[in-house]
Amino acid sequence: MKTAFSLETVNTRYQEPNRNRVESKYYWEELFQLVGAGGFHAVELPYDPGFMGARCCFPFSKVVMDVKFGGVEGFKKVLADAKIDKIAGIFASPRAAGSVEQYVEGFKRSVKGMLGLAGELGCDYVTVSASPEYCTMGALLDKKAELLDALAAALGELADEAGDIKLCVRNEFWGILRGAGMHDFMAKVDKRVGYCVDLAHIKIAGEDPAEFIRKAGDRVGVVILTDTCFEDKDEVWKGPAPAFPRTGATQVFKDLGQGSVDLCAVFAALKEVGFDGWATVDNRQTRQVSRGILRARYALNAVEG
């Protein structure tokens, strides 16, 4: 099993004191050094081709890599200087509205763009969210079965274009593929498409991550090592901004090792199914990125012995 560190750990979408520092190139250059020093020699990138254009240094699109880092090779050199020798994968949560046809066509365009960039970056995997957030679906909820059938067919087409890149579907607790519902959907999808198993999302949806992995079996394509203590007693998943509940606990995700996900059981299940792909740490909503890197390394060392 190989480990990577996701740059989604950095808060780029919500305001906080001194948030603008993350728009500076020096911030990312130092972050890469910290990631490498923490023993992570591969990273995962969020993909957002239009976010902020080239006005900041979030390395999440080809445009920013070209303008701020001198292209893909220039970006990879910055990583290499920090002892990061691999971009393991990229991910996105394509969002669209309108009819089933409009949603699926928008989804396909987004994934094709991801696959193109992943090829340039030398990624091993691309992960996508096939389901929109429940609260944004509107009229699509009445056509759920039609939408899922169309998405399953689209993923089969995209698998043809993926080539050696492993295309995986992410599970999210706020989508219509939450929890065990993912298995029914994946049964319809081309076997070349794998599961992207996000531990915290599975647990919040009321499932046991280790059992989920066993049921997915050899179709586990990538594992996202997330943690949580959150219990969705108020069905936050159905409302707006489910990652930021309006009542009760306001931090849904925890740094790896700080929540209630049983990592030992997860790693045992991964061994049972013969998983040898990427396990990517994502400390989303961390209160301090540098501390989160060390917490994750400590948690992995404890599990791996």
Segment roles from a protein language model:
Residues 29-35, 72-76, 111-115, 152-159, ...:
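Generic structural signal for well-ordered alpha-helices
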Residues 280-291:
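A short, acidic, flexible beta-alpha connecting loop/helix-capping segment that sits on the rim
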Residues 5-9, 45-49, 88-93, 128-132, ...:
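A cross-domain feature marking catalytic cores of carbohydrate-active enzymes
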Residues 226-228, 264, 271:
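Catalytic-face loop-and-helix region of soluble metabolic enzyme cores
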Residues 11-19, 25, 42-43, 152-260:
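Acidic/histidine-rich catalytic cores of soluble enzymes
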Residues 1-120, 164, 191-194, 297-305:
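N-terminal pre-domain/capping segments
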Residues 74, 78-82, 86, 95-194, ...:
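Active-site acidic/histidine proton-transfer and metal-coordination neighborhood
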Residues 41, 85, 124, 221, ...:
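Short acidic/polar active-site loop segments enriched in Thr and Asp
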